[in-house]
Amino acid sequence: MRSEMLTALLTLAVLLQVAGSLKIAAFNIRSFGETKMSNATLTSYIVRILQRYDIALIQEVRDSHLTAVGKLLDKLNEKAADTYRFVASEPLGRRTYKERYLFVYRPDQVSVLDSYYYDDGCEPCGTDTFSREPAVVRFSSPSTKVREFAIVPLHSAPEDAVAEIDALYDVYLDVQKKWGLQDVMLMGDFNADYSYVTSSQWSSIRLRTNPAFKWLIPDTADTTATSTNCAYDRIVVAGPLLQDAVVPNSAAPFNFQAAYGLSNQLAQAISDHYPVEVTLA
């Protein structure tokens, strides 16, 4: 009897732990738009990957009228309506080339409380900081240790990666000032490796040198689906509640090629990046 009771309690504890977890990812889906969504094979794998997550930040969204985004949400909600919702930025970029930041999320797990664009200066004057300024989103997460947190997205311009990653420190301070919020996740394709950020340049990046920020994806990680071995994509967390909520060893790239047994050609057709993911308890 005692053995059965202990087993039942352990099972309940496991269920509660799973129920109270939140899986978050940042995924640069190369040139995500109508062409990619018109390919049934690529679409099926993209949907399969995104269904792993409660919140997913998608970058490199080339979709002027949100047509591809609409098709993606239709696929994500195919089995049950309103399984996923989305928040999309306006097209961002200094010249004719523009991208959106796209968040897809499960409304049964989190809700969007607010969002805003970080003001990084005068774009027409050429004095702005970011090629694609962060569109910051504030989430409520009632089932995790941290009940509210913000996500700051960044897909940096490779040639400006050092300056843009460093400027995320200023974005964090701005989020604190605007919302009085310490718990912030900064993530995306930072281009934080190779010749874009060299080992000697890390000391000039405040987001790296300030101990308030915890980098979850190490420099040794490979976040690319190509033959390169680079840690371009990162997740950084700040704030005591958010840092405490991170499940140990849960932050990593998700190698979908290995997980699904894909050829190099098919994997790279999906994207040249792997998602980077983390679980909150």
UniProtKB/Swiss-Prot annotation:
Gene3D superfamilies named in the record: Endonuclease/exonuclease/phosphatase
Disulfide bonds: C122-C125
EC number(s) on file: 3.1.21.1
Signal peptide range: 1-21
Pfam families noted in UniProt: Exo_endo_phos
UniProt xrefs under SMART domains: DNaseIc
Glycosylation site residues: N39
CC terms in the record's Gene Ontology section: extracellular region; nuclear envelope; zymogen granule
Catalytic site positions: E99, H155
Location of this chain's protein in the cell: Secreted; Zymogen granule; Nucleus envelope
Keyword Glycoprotein attributed: yes
Cofactor binding, per record: Divalent metal cations. Prefers Ca(2+) or Mg(2+).
Annotated site (Involved in actin-binding): E34
Required co-factors: Ca(2+); Mg(2+)
GO BP field: apoptotic process; DNA catabolic process; neutrophil activation involved in immune response; regulation of acute inflammatory response; regulation of neutrophil mediated cytotoxicity
Keywords noted in UniProt: Actin-binding, Apoptosis, Calcium, Cytoplasmic vesicle, Disulfide bond, Endonuclease, Glycoprotein, Hydrolase, Nuclease, Nucleus, Secreted, Signal
Reactions this protein catalyses: Endonucleolytic cleavage to 5'-phosphodinucleotide and 5'-phosphooligonucleotide end-products
Tissues where the protein occurs: Equivalent levels in pancreas and parotid gland, low amounts in kidney, liver, small intestine, stomach and thymus.
GO molecular function: actin binding; deoxyribonuclease I activity; DNA binding
SUPFAM superfamilies given in the database record: DNase I-like
Function: Serum endocuclease secreted into body fluids by a wide variety of exocrine and endocrine organs. Expressed by non-hematopoietic tissues and preferentially cleaves protein-free DNA. Among other functions, seems to be involved in cell death by apoptosis. Binds specifically to G-actin and blocks actin polymerization. Preferentially attacks double-stranded DNA and produces oligonucleotides with 5'-phospho and 3'-hydroxy termini. Together with DNASE1L3, plays a key role in degrading neutrophil extracellular traps (NETs).
The family this protein is said to belong to: Belongs to the DNase I family.
Protein's recorded name: Deoxyribonuclease-1
